[in-house]
Structure formats: structure tokens, C-alpha cells
């Protein structure tokens, strides 16, 4: 096969994958910056709002993006939006949890922490970097079905070099 044909096939494959991602099924979810906002919305009761917030906080410690330095974290999430978390194997920098998402899943509720980036501080993002759509006044939004799956625990730390260096990721 000629080089040009391989290139066209590659572009076609990328295009199909891109369209598949755009057409991903959406599910309704609830997003809130705090327990108080969840309670005020009136969609669920206070006990549920508190319990799901606690679940999101616990999950945050496992799935939050990890950084080797404050500067790297601040670059992605904004100045003073990160904190140092000392662990048995050393310490890492994590972004603050800025909200949480509740998504009905069968007879239960799936919950995960949400973050705000420095480049888009008015939107929520999942720990995997998925952008969460704008919510209505009561917190309702539509998210890609893939964003309502359990995020993977983070075992890697992001580190970036200076001018002319590459970003690296190391297991923790």
C-alpha cells in the first residue's frame, strides 16, 4: 500500500473514533460544589447529600491527579488550588476537590469528586479530565456515560521539566 493511502486510512480511522466519541450516550447526573448546594437544590435529602459528599471525598484521595511539585499542580488547576498530601512513600500534590457528581446507577447512586482547572475555572472536570456539562439551577446535567464509571485509582505522579524538557509520569 502506498504511503498516501496509509495516511488516508489513518485519518479515516481517527475520524470514525472522533465521531464515536461525540455520539457517546449521555446520562443525567447531579453536580454540586458543596453539601449546602445539594440540600438547597432539593433534589435529594440532606442525609444523602452528606453521605455522597463523604464518598466523593474518600474517592478523591484515591483518584485525584497527582503531581510531583506544587508548580505542576498550580499550572493545571490554578494557584492555591492544590495541597501537599504526605503519604507513606513520600508526598505528592493534589488539586482540591471543588465539587461532586451523583449519577443514578440502577438502584444505587454513583458518586465521584470533581475539579476545576485553571484554563476553565467555571466548569467541573472528572479526575480523568472529562469535562462535565453546565448544570441547571438544581444541579442537573448530562454527562457522557463513560464519566459515570468508577475512576481508576491513581498510582502515577506527573512531573514536568523546564524549557526543552519532556513531561514524565512515575509510579508511586
PLM regions: where:
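Low-complexity, glycine/proline/serine-enriched intrinsically disordered segments
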Residues: 2-5, 11-15, 23-172
Amino acid at each position: 500500500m502506498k504511503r498516501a493511502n496509509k495516511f488516508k486510512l489513518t485519518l479515516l480511522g481517527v475520524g470514525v473514533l472522533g465521531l464515536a466519541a461525540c455520539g457517546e450516550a449521555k446520562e443525567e447526573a447531579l453536580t454540586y460544589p458543596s453539601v449546602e448546594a445539594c440540600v438547597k437544590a432539593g433534589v435529594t435529602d440532606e442525609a444523602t447529600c452528606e453521605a455522597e459528599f463523604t464518598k466523593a471525598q474518600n474517592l478523591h484521595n484515591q483518584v485525584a491527579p497527582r503531581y510531583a511539585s506544587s508548580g505542576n499542580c498550580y499550572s493545571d488547576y490554578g494557584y492555591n488550588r492544590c495541597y501537599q498530601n504526605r503519604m507513606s512513600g513520600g508526598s505528592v500534590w493534589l488539586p482540591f476537590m471543588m465539587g461532586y457528581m451523583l449519577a443514578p446507577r440502577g438502584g444505587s447512586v454513583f458518586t465521584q469528586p470533581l475539579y476545576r482547572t485553571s484554563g476553565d475555572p467555571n466548569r467541573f472536570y472528572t479526575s480523568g479530565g472529562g469535562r462535565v456539562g453546565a448544570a441547571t439551577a438544581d444541579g442537573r446535567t448530562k454527562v457522557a456515560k463513560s464519566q459515570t464509571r468508577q475512576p481508576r485509582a491513581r498510582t502515577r505522579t506527573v512531573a514536568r521539566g523546564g524549557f526543552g524538557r519532556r513531561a514524565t509520569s512515575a509510579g508511586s
